[in-house]
Every structure is written in structure tokens, then in C-alpha cells.
């Protein structure tokens, strides 16, 4: 049996302002070169989202030699496309709704109260960039975690291939969606 990370994950195009460049450099630095694999890892983690990051930091703190493999951006969907972006936009819309109803509370606002969607999106990008510092490659490296970018494929019960390199391990954890395919029997 082999496990492959699905190929439908990709790095979405984003505006390249200073805030986005900061975020991308923390989550997948331009010009990144995967490290030379260790002879054997105590733990290989596939997926650099919240679960993978917590597992990597925790195992490294306990003394394990850890490799983390991510296909796209560290931080996963939650930071980059899901939870964080949606919650910041939801907060803006709720605030607008509260301000629109300010008269109920004895406050008055201009009649032409409007949401500047461009400013709301810029706020979301700033928040994402700030949070990305906690999920950064530098923080993982400081913890002693080897970070590899690329597609992961198990090629034996104790090894995974990523970007042409073979990573041997004692234990592995898939913390992102994976596809299971039965190999030759």
C-alpha cells in the first residue's frame, strides 16, 4: 500500500504587497532548498497545518529527530485560506452590522456608513502575516525540525520520498488529507 498526498492542493495566487511577501517568506521562502535528509528520523510528519506543526514542535521538544513535509504553505488551510481569513472578514461584517444598528443604543453615525472591502482585505492580510510568524520555517528550524517542501509518497514501511529524497523513519504521521492506493501484491 502507498499513501500519496492529493495533487489538488496548490499555492493560490495572491497580491504581492509587502504584507503578503512577508507571509509567504515565513511559510515557504523563495529559493528554499530542502535539507539533506538525516540518516533516520524518529518522526516524519506529512502536512504542515495546525496538527502537523503542533506534532513537530512537540516531538522535537521531547528530543525526537523530526522531519515535516508540506506541499504548499506552512500553516495549512486554516491560516492561509480558511479559519483566519474567514474570521477576520466575519468580524468586519459583524462590526458593520452593529454600527448600522447604533441608533438602537443611542448613538448616531453618518447616513452613508460603508465598508471599504479593500481595507477589510488588507486587515485580513496583516493578521494572517502576523500569525504566520508562529508557523514560520524559522521557528521550526529553531526547534530542530527539518522542513521539506514537495509531494510525499511512502515507498516502504519505513521510508517516504519527497522531491527525490528518501526520508527513513521510525514513525510517521499524516496530518493532512491523504490518498491511499494499494500497491502491487
Which residues does each predicted region cover?
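Glycine-rich flavin
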Residues: 2-41, 58-64, 69-185
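Glycine-rich Rossmann-fold phosphate-binding loop(s) that bind the pyrophosphate
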Residues: 47-50, 71-72
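Residues forming the Rossmann-fold NAD(P)(H) cofactor-binding site
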Residues: 53
Amino acid at each position: 500500500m502507498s499513501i500519496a498526498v492529493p495533487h489538488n492542493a496548490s499555492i493560490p495566487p495572491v497580491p504581492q504587497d509587502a504584507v503578503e511577501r512577508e507571509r509567504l517568506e515565513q511559510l515557504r521562502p523563495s529559493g528554499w532548498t530542502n535539507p539533506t535528509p538525516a540518516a533516520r528520523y524518529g518522526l516524519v510528519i506529512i502536512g504542515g497545518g495546525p496538527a502537523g506543526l503542533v506534532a513537530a514542535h512537540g516531538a522535537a521538544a521531547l528530543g525526537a529527530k523530526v522531519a515535516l513535509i508540506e506541499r504548499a504553505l506552512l500553516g495549512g488551510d486554516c491560516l492561509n485560506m480558511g479559519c483566519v481569513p474567514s474570521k477576520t472578514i466575519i468580524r468586519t461584517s459583524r462590526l458593520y452590522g452593529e454600527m448600522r444598528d447604533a441608533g438602537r443604543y443611542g448613538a448616531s453615525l453618518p447616513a452613508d456608513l460603508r465598508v471599504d472591502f479593500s481595507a477589510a482585505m488588507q486587515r485580513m492580510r496583516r493578521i494572517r502575516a502576523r500569525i504566520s510568524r508562529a508557523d514560520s520555517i524559522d521557528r521550526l528550524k529553531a526547534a530542530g525540525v527539518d522542513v521539506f517542501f514537495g509531494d510525499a509518497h511512502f515507498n516502504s514501511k519505513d521510508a517516504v520520498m519527497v522531491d527525490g529524497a528518501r526520508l527513513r523513519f521510525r514513525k510517521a504521521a499524516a496530518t493532512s488529507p491523504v490518498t491511499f492506493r494499494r500497491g502491487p501484491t
